């Protein structure tokens, strides 16, 4: 397998508020290290992170780094 084609990091920015969202979505944002609008974090692109991003993708802007 060629590791050069794999994306290692993902930059995630919270663009919508967690107010009025389900409790598990709020916990997912906290788990990703996001707690304020326009806060960005760079995360390793793992299966668990991908699952968390999919759960709250409507609140985020996701970019490959």
UniProtKB/Swiss-Prot annotation:
What are its GO biological-process terms? translation
Q: Name one GO cellular component term.
A: cytosolic large ribosomal subunit
| Signal peptide residues on this chain, from the entry's feature table | none
Q: Does the keyword Cytoplasm apply?
A: no
Domain of life per record? Bacteria
Task: List the keywords (alphabetical).
Answer: Ribonucleoprotein, Ribosomal protein
What CDD domains does its record include?
Ribosomal_L30 (cd01658)
Q: Care to name a GO molecular-function term for this sequence? A: structural constituent of ribosome
Q: How does it assemble?
A: Part of the 50S ribosomal subunit.
Q: Which family does it belong to?
A: Belongs to the universal ribosomal protein uL30 family.
Name it. Large ribosomal subunit protein uL30
The organism named in the record is Rickettsia bellii (strain OSU 85-389)
Task: Please name the taxonomic classification of the source.
Answer: Bacteria, Pseudomonadati, Pseudomonadota, Alphaproteobacteria, Rickettsiales
